Amino acid sequence: IKPEHYMPAFEEGIRQHDAEIAAIIANPEAPTFKNTIEPLEFSGMLLTQVNLIFSSLTEAETNDELQAIAKEISPKLTEHYDNISLNGELFARIKTVYENRDKENLDTEQMKVLENHYKDFVRAGALLSEEDKATLREINN
């Protein structure tokens, strides 16, 4: 893998992740673990892999070219993840599943995954007002 391969890989990972999140939001069925939490759990795999490889490399053996890529991709990743964690439509689906978790007949692992996603979104600002979300976005960038 050469340094010039990273930005296109990051951009494709972001594009795929955006499409996966959009599909979850666009699902016309009532939110369930199967149609909301499960696809959320497995979304963004390419982006995660690219980021893991890139981060490992920059921590182990960095150079000016890799540092320039890191500087360029960092705000894009922050914006991308803010767009997910502060997305009201996505959080509404997660919250519905969370509030109906006792009706879902989830096993222990599924319950833990659901709770983790719900808490992660809350901690990331999903319950903030739109004004406060905008402020948080500014702080994050």
Model-predicted segments: where are they?
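Zn2+-dependent metallopeptidase catalytic domains
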Residues: 1-141
